[in-house]
Amino acid sequence: HHDPIIEKPSDWKQLKQPEVEYDDVKTNRLYEAAGDALGDILEPKLVGVTNFSFHMMHWYCDYRGLNNMMMDLIDEPNMVHETIRFFTEGVKSMLKQYEDLNLISLNNDDTFFYTGGLGYTDELPAVGFNPDGVRLCDVWAAAEAQEFSSISPAMHEEFILSYEREILKPFGLTG
């Protein structure tokens, strides 16, 4: 049983869009401390964001519960659309902040990729790559909605796939 955090449509209004903060001084201090502590054993590597996996229907279920989500698709479809749109806009805003703050690192190497493998590919980074400013088109991303395994293809398209495609569009590869 799941007691929903969000009980009525107006409760969603309490959520705020993500705001990315980065403290360069603190990050470098921690990086240097790790190097001092581990430098003889292994070399720390300073990287930015490498994991781009999006689970908006899972987030919805975290707030409403799986049973309520299933009922909402029929009883409150506008609430579902408004919420997934809110999540979509939040993710897009967060991604822009990552790019603006230069916080993205390549993930076409031994970085674990959400779908269960490693990111190795020679298709990334994209043409025009600049190592001083990794772009979304230079990296992998993924999205999923396992909660929709029992939902019709039409509802899957309507309630989540169209939003996921919007988020994944700027990425170099998706899986």
Regions found by a protein language model. Name each.
Residues 1-17:
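Well-ordered mid-protein domain cores that form the structural environment of catalytic cofactors
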Residues 18-175:
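Active-site loop segments of alpha/beta catalytic cores
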